[in-house]
Amino acid sequence: MMMHKNDPQTEAGKLPPLELVHKMGEFIGEHAKAGRVLDGAGLAGSKTRTRLTFRNGEVTIKNGPYRGEHELPAGTLLLKVKTREEAIGWAERYGKILGDGEIELGKVNEPWDIGVMPAPENPPLQMLLIDKADKATEAGGRTAQQKAAISRLKTEMTKAGVLVRSLNLQPTSKGKRLTFTNNNLQVLDGPFAESKELLGGFAVLELSGFEEAIAMCRTYAEILGGTLEVDVRIVDQTEDAA
C-alpha cells in the first residue's frame, strides 16, 4: 500500500487542476492495465472527517476540521453508508473491541467531487475507516480474542451491505517512508513514527518489491509537484489477519 499525505489544496476543498487530474488518470490507468493496481481512493479534507478516541472504556468523538496527530494506519475498512452518523456507529463498535486507541473516518472522494462528472441522484456515501497503529499492531498484531471479535463484526457489516472491503498492514518495521523535496528523494527504512499529516489517499498495488514501488512513487511525486511524503507498507495477507 502506498499512502500519500493530505495537502493544503485538498484541505481547503479546492478542486485539483484538470491537467493534474488527466495526468494522474493516465498514470493510474497505465498501471491498472498492467494489472498492478488492486485498489485505491483519495480522501476529502478534514472538515468531512471524524476522529474517535477510546480511553478507559469511554469514547470521545470529534468532527473536523482538525490537524493530523497520530497518523499511522494499521488497517482500513471501506464502508458504504447512508449517513456519517451510521459510519460513526460502526466505528464505535469496532473501536470498543480494541480498547484504548484511535480511529478516523474520512469521506472518500468520488468522481463528481473532483469535477470529473456530474453527481448522480442520491449518490452513495463511502467512508474509509482508518484503524490507527498502536504498540500491539507494531509488535505483530492484535490478540486472538480481538481478531475473533473483529472478524464477527466484519461479517455482520458485510451482511448489512456496509463493508465493501478491508485490509490490514504489516508493522512499519517492514515498510519505508519516502520524502520528496523538489523531486529529491530521502528514504527512511522502518520502523518509523506516526506522522503529523493526515492521510490524503492510498493505492494498493501488486508489485515485485520496494524497488518497483519507489520507481512508481518517483513518477507520482513528479505529477504532484515534486514535494510530498509517501509511506510504503506491506499488506498483511496471512489467514489470521483481522
Over which residues does each language-model region extend?
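Conserved, structured core segments of small domains
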Residues: 1-242
